[in-house]
């Protein structure tokens, strides 16, 4: 028997860890010792020398504990940096977090806005570029401030939207930057020397991502081949947690892909007939010009249309259904110029040996200041039909894929990496 605040209590097989009156607010105040929650106690009227006997009817042994206070997180607890360029990309990123953490203070010279949270066992810092300030230089500034304020960030992600290179890549697909041949996963196409026309020769190289991320990427690619992507599962989870986002961020049924032919009508014009029609229009236009009947229409517009329809024919062979999400691994071309021309896009791809899967505007600025993996949801084809219809859905798909990658990133591997701030200080 042990004395506990004047009460005689049995010691075995039961254990009290805290004073009786602080254990459970559910004990009645009539000093009978009965618990309103379980009513499984046999007790006598309590007094200064009474005995409290707890029965073994429900618990054996009975251990009552107090909740351990949650540890207060500091800047040093965050090891993953996640950078996005657009508010819609930040919305998708925040919606993918398992938990959202309270904000922390930041230095006066840090103008970034941060969202803190966690996925799996990783504490994550999300930062978005200032509204209206896009491109490589702005991305580099945001990343530099982030690793200064959160000095133990060791791995980075650049997650958002980009333009796909057909016919390999389709709207709603995901492209993950992966080292390819002599390229480190991301190439800054507008750093180099011009040779002929729009062709150029790339000069210099960008940093590779941390080894921990590349290891996780290998596991992710293997799992995708064997079991398929879990991206759709994470998209569905987002819809359950944030139902207001469903119409634009998780549902692609109402979105149209200009390179996807899904016309079951018996009167539908075949792709080859369409190509033939464009060809004869170009011939007649040239003939009319030579005879002085009309001015010559821009030839590249017809060529772009023919390229699109040819891509349609190739894409049809893949039989991808609307809503399917495919993940591609390969080269991303990054530059400070928006690409909205199919001819230039294809020339750029050809100059990089046909390895380009995606074009975008921020990643190259990060690679030397914030070595990371770039994940892009495809929202357009970087041609004259570029629009914003697919952007929110593509942002959510990219964020879901980033979450899946983090599920395969081992905390022990992250611990083994040096902080990005230290790596950069070494020059």
Residues of each region from the PLM?
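Cysteine-centered motifs
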Residues: 24, 35-38
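Intrinsically disordered, low-complexity segments enriched in serine/threonine/proline/glycine
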Residues: 11, 29, 38-41, 52
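Residue-identity detector for glycine
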Residues: 6, 30-33, 47, 427
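Intrinsic-disorder/coil detector with helix-boundary
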Residues: 35, 60-427
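Aromatic (phenylalanine/tyrosine) cluster motif
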Residues: 5, 14-20, 27, 59
């Amino acid at each position: 028997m042990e004395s506990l605040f004047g009460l005689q209590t049995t010691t075995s097989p039961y254990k009290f860890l805290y004073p009786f009156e602080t254990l459970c607010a559910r004990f009645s105040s009539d000093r009978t010792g009965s618990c309103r929650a379980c009513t499984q106690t046999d007790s006598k009227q309590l007094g200064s020398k009474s005995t409290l006997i707890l029965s073994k009817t429900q618990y054996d042994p009975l251990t009552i504990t107090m909740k351990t206070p949650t540890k207060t997180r500091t800047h040093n607890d965050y090891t993953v940096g996640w950078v996005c360029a657009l508010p819609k990309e930040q919305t998708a990123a925040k919606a993918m977090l398992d938990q959202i953490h309270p904000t922390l203070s930041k230095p006066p010279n840090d103008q970034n806005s941060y969202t803190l949270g966690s996925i799996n066992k990783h504490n994550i810092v999300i930062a978005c570029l200032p509204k209206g300030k896009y491109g490589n230089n702005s991305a580099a500034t945001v990343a530099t401030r982030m690793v200064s304020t959160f000095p133990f960030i060791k791995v980075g992600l650049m997650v958002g939207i980009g333009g796909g290179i057909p016919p390999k890549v389709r709207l709603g697909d995901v492209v993950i930057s992966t080292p390819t041949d002599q390229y480190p996963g991301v190439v800054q196409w507008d750093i180099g020397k011009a040779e002929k026309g729009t062709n150029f020769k790339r000069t210099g190289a960008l940093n590779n991502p941390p080894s921990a991320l590349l290891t996780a990427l290998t596991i992710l690619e293997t799992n995708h081949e064997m079991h398929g992507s879990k991206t759709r599962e994470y998209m569905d989870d987002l819809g359950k947690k944030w139902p207001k986002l469903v119409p634009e961020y998780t549902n692609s049924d109402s979105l149209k892909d200009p390179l996807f032919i899904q016309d079951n009508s018996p009167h539908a014009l075949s792709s080859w007939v369409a190509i033939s029609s464009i060809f004869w229009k170009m011939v007649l236009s040239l003939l009319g010009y030579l005879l002085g009947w009309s001015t010559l229409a821009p030839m590249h517009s017809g060529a772009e249309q023919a390229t699109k329809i040819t891509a349609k024919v190739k894409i049809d062979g893949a039989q991808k259904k609307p809503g399917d999400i495919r993940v591609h691994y390969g080269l991303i071309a990054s530059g400070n110029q928006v690409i909205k021309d199919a001819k230039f896009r294809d020339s750029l791809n050809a100059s990089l040996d046909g390895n380009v899967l995606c074009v975008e505007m921020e990643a190259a600025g990060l690679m030397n200041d914030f070595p990371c993996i770039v994940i892009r949801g495809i929202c357009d084809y970087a041609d004259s039909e570029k629009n914003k219809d697919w952007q929110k859905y593509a942002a959510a798909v990219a964020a879901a894929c980033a979450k899946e990658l983090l599920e395969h990133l081992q905390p022990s591997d992250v611990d083994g990496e040096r902080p990005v701030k230290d790596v950069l200080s070494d020059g």
